[in-house]
Amino acid sequence: MQQIQVQLGDRSYPIYIGQDLMNDSELFARYLTNKKALIVSNDTIAPLYLQQIQQAMSACARIETVILPDGEKFKDLQHLDYIFTELLEHNFARDSVLVALGGGVVGDMTGFAAACYQRGIEFIQVPTTLLSQVDSSVGGKTAVNHPLGKNMIGAFYQPKSVIIDTFCLQTLPANEFAAGMAEVIKYGIIWDADFFQWLEANVDALKSLQTDALNYAIAKCCQIKADVVAQDETEQGVRALLNLGHTFGHAIEAEMGYGVWLHGEAVSAGTVLAAQTAYKLNLLDEQSVERICRLMQAFDLPITAPESMGFEQFIKHMRRDKKVLGGKIRLVLPTEIGKADVFSDVSEDLLKQVISCV
């Protein structure tokens, strides 16, 4: 088992990475002994893993469970209320713990519920998708969607620990694995050119779910994320770089309907649009754009936006993006493989050119 620490003073917490961790009763006992715990999962993950995690936790905690419908379209205030209702009906107190068993949707909703319930209770992330293991479970971003924008209602609220059981990836559908790889590739583009090159050389190993390759990639991403969050927890500076591709990507998700495109698929297309924007601004060379496109395609990810989306469909959502300041759209753009920056002077005319060329 590998362990990575997110350094946030008295709110620091560990990320555990390994196989069969969901059966590790001693690991759960560190956080749940003599406590009441509510497991939040969905109707896809629960049949696969709920029973074993209940067995691991039952030796140390009193357990209740709430099962949500699976999908991004259910990440809303209505379904968040299911969690609150369960907590209230079973008299959960401030010393209780929420346990998120699922992908990014379950993790985001559980974390937000923990932040809100009785003004804050503890929660643990047990991410089951590649995307949630390498990105959304780490760093304390919690939220639900609104029809007018993704993740618009939420809070920064850190978990007590993140428990990554890599065995879960054996049951992950191929398109969900690919979606997670979009976030993995992102780390190479914004932060680590050597890691990007390693990804280019290990496509087959990763797609065939080779344990050593997966463990290395997951640990590398978690370490980068932990380092970034330690520097900038609430996204006032360097953490914004983790949003590469997300301004375009969130527009795709909102316009197409949440869940029609997986988050990682939208981030993939959005990352390519960001790279093409950087090329138009003479910030990024053509070879780097091509490398980004090839690597996304190697993992069966889309590199173009939906045909039905033109400039007007993009821009109405981009103007509502959380990174907008002073009425200006701020974009994370790569300047070379391994480096990126935030730009607030990208004109809508140039964005129109980029989107129209896709």
UniProtKB/Swiss-Prot annotation:
Keyword Transmembrane helix appears in the UniProt entry: no
GO cellular component: cytoplasm
Keyword Metal-binding: yes
InterPro entries, per the entry: Dehydroquinate_synthase, DHQ_synth_AroB, DHQ_synth_fam, DHQS/DOIS_N, DHQS_C
GO biological process, one term: aromatic amino acid family biosynthetic process
Pathway noted in the entry: Metabolic intermediate biosynthesis; chorismate biosynthesis; chorismate from D-erythrose 4-phosphate and phosphoenolpyruvate: step 2/7
Top-level taxon: Bacteria
One Gene Ontology MF term: metal ion binding
Signal sequence coordinates: none
Free-text remark on how the cofactor is bound: Binds 1 divalent metal cation per subunit. Can use either Co(2+) or Zn(2+).
Subcellular location: Cytoplasm
First-listed, main subcellular location of the protein, grouped into a coarse class: cytoplasm
Swiss-Prot/TrEMBL keywords: Amino-acid biosynthesis, Aromatic amino acid biosynthesis, Cobalt, Cytoplasm, Lyase, Metal-binding, NAD, Nucleotide-binding, Zinc
Cofactor requirements of the protein: Co(2+); Zn(2+); NAD(+)
Reaction(s) catalysed by this chain's protein: 7-phospho-2-dehydro-3-deoxy-D-arabino-heptonate = 3-dehydroquinate + phosphate
Broad EC category: lyase
Enzyme nomenclature, EC number: 4.2.3.4
Binding site for NAD(+): 70-75, 104-108, 128-129, 141, 150, 168-171
Chain's role: Catalyzes the conversion of 3-deoxy-D-arabino-heptulosonate 7-phosphate (DAHP) to dehydroquinate (DHQ).
Family: Belongs to the sugar phosphate cyclases superfamily. Dehydroquinate synthase family.
Protein name: 3-dehydroquinate synthase
Taxonomic classification: Bacteria, Pseudomonadati, Pseudomonadota, Gammaproteobacteria, Alteromonadales
